[in-house]
Amino acid sequence: MNHNTPPTEEIAFEGRIGEIVHAKQPDGRIFEYYRRPPGVRLVIVTPDNKILVTKEHRRETGGIDLRLPGGKVRDTLEEYHQLLASGQDMTQAAAEAAAKEALEETGLIISSPQLLTRANAGATVEWDLYYFLVEQHQESQHGQELEQGEDIEVAYLTPAEVRKAVTKGEMQEWRSVGVLLGMVLPRLEQSA
């Protein structure tokens, strides 16, 4: 169960998509954190500056949530460890996952995704989200390719509608809200 962890780390628990890590500090204390495969989020923008969002029922919110489309860079912890061991660039792996998720969730074939930022979850959770801006896309003739059990509706919102959805609490993935409000909407509103 080593997974090439540094000598100061010990895996205390390993699940299907994450693990509890005990990291020994220089003073001997143990710092515990949770690590899981990183994820991707897509900021898909149309020529008329609308942003694609998905509407889906989310277990964690207990209702419908507006979200940026996306998913995991790798589906399991084992696949994530294999990716790390391969030496492949994580940003490149994230861009490939972004293309896969775009097709599955939105039915769009994307090209030239541009990394906006990598947002971390905080000190006690290692779960980065790679945000990609996508301005070049076309519809797949097959439409969405949803996984079993997924029910995802696609909508296009203006920057003003995105702000309203955030204010009303309809978008609850707060890292995505931060990226939208801090990086994306100012750019779109400036170019309008």
Feature locations, PLM:
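Short Lys/Arg-enriched alpha/beta "domain-start" segment
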Residues: M1-N2
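Acidic, metal-coordinating catalytic segment for phosphate/diphosphate chemistry
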Residues: P6-D48, E56
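Acidic pyrophosphate-coordinating catalytic loop
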Residues: A12-R16, R59, R118-L129
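Active-site-adjacent beta-strand/loop module that shapes the phosphate/pyrophosphate-binding cleft
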Residues: A23-R29, G122-Q141, A155
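Nudix hydrolase/Nudix homology domain
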Residues: P6, I64, G70-G71, A123-T124, ...
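Conserved Nudix-box catalytic region and its N-terminal flanking loop in Nudix hydrolases
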Residues: Y34-R36, R41-K100, Q148
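Conserved hydrophobic "DFG−1" position in protein kinase catalytic cores
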Residues: I44, V53, L133-V134, Y156
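A short coil-to-beta-strand element that immediately follows conserved catalytic motifs
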Residues: I109-L116
